[in-house]
């Protein structure tokens, strides 16, 4: 039986990180975790990482699509934070970010790792950005690298 499984180390991978500015006090912690994971665990060279800042989580899919269509990147990490408020705005932004990024991955055939926090409150977001619940930015970066390697294995099989 042949087993295909992606590894994390991807020293030659070209990775784009797209990060929302809105809720930057949380997103910057996600970014720190993602960059640390890419460089330290994934062994990705700094010159192979491109950072793109967008206004908010809603804008992540469009920019991710443009990056994917450029064919310059092996994987994309999308980072942002959407915190529930008193209106339906949360559902719209979180839903569009999630489905839009998924569509980019499927249509462009490129790993797009979802590092967008969707939380009930600020405390939950802070916990997921590097305190009690780990750093979801780092987790998303590792997912992107593993998927880059896994897709390469599938292509070579």
Swiss-Prot record:
5-amino-6-(D-ribitylamino)uracil binds at residues 22, 57-59, 81-83, 114. InterPro entries: LS (IPR034964), LS/RS (IPR002180), LS/RS_sf (IPR036467). SUPFAM superfamilies: Lumazine synthase (SSF52121). The active site is at 89 (proton donor). GO terms for biological process: riboflavin biosynthetic process. Its EC number is 2.5.1.78. It is an enzyme of class 2 (transferase). NCBIfam families: lumazine-synth, PRK00061.1-4. Catalyzes the formation of 6,7-dimethyl-8-ribityllumazine by condensation of 5-amino-6-(D-ribitylamino)uracil with 3,4-dihydroxy-2-butanone 4-phosphate. This is the penultimate step in the biosynthesis of riboflavin. Forms an icosahedral capsid composed of 60 subunits, arranged as a dodecamer of pentamers. This is 6,7-dimethyl-8-ribityllumazine synthase. It comes from Pasteurella multocida (strain Pm70).
């Amino acid at each position: 039986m042949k087993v295909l499984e992606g590894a994390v180390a991807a020293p030659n991978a070209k990775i784009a990180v797209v990060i929302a500015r809105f809720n930057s006090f949380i997103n910057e912690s996600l970014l720190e975790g993602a960059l640390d994971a890419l460089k330290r665990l994934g062994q990705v060279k700094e010159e192979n990482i491109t950072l793109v800042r967008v206004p908010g989580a809603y804008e992540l899919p469009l920019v991710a699509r443009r990056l994917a269509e450029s064919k310059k990147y092996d994987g994309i990490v999308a980072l942002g934070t959407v915190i529930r408020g008193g209106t339906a705005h949360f559902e719209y932004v979180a839903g569009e970010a999630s489905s839009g990024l998924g569509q980019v991955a499927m249509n462009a055939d490129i790993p797009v790792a979802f590092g967008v926090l969707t939380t009930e409150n600020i405390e939950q977001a802070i916990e997921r950005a590097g305190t009690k619940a780990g750093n979801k930015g780092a987790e998303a970066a590792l997912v992107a690298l593993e998927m880059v390697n896994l897709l390469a294995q599938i292509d070579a099989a």
